Amino acid sequence: LKANDEVLEIGTGSGFITACLAHMARAVTSIDIHTDFLETAKAKLNTLDLNNVRFEQADALTYQPQQQFDAVLVTGAVAVVPEAFKHWLRPGGRLFVIQGLSPVQEALCLTRNGDLFDVESLLETDVAYLTGAQPESKFTL
């Protein structure tokens, strides 16, 4: 991240990553579907005197931000990267997301290049899905 970046964090969680982002970027918008996570993170960040974070209660899968961002960080996995996440990026912006079917998921960095996206595979992992972003159940015998 660059010092003048505006960042969107999807999945506030405990606020730890939010605090890290706030130290590195100019402005951070952090969204979470769980109000209790947001309240806990706000309280923690207030003790650190970080004033460049805006918290919003929202479902990432239906979220409609009022702006685009230099970077978007998704802290939970998705079965498939929603197209909307990509369009929240400014030209040259980067999206960090974990995609795939547990137990084999892939951390990706997508960089917006006009209407196209360069995709870099970073590592394999296995993390919990964002609420509502888990794969559909399939019936098998």
State each model region's role.
Residues 1-117:
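Conserved nucleotide-cofactor-binding alpha/beta core module
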Residues 100-141:
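Active-site capping/gating segments
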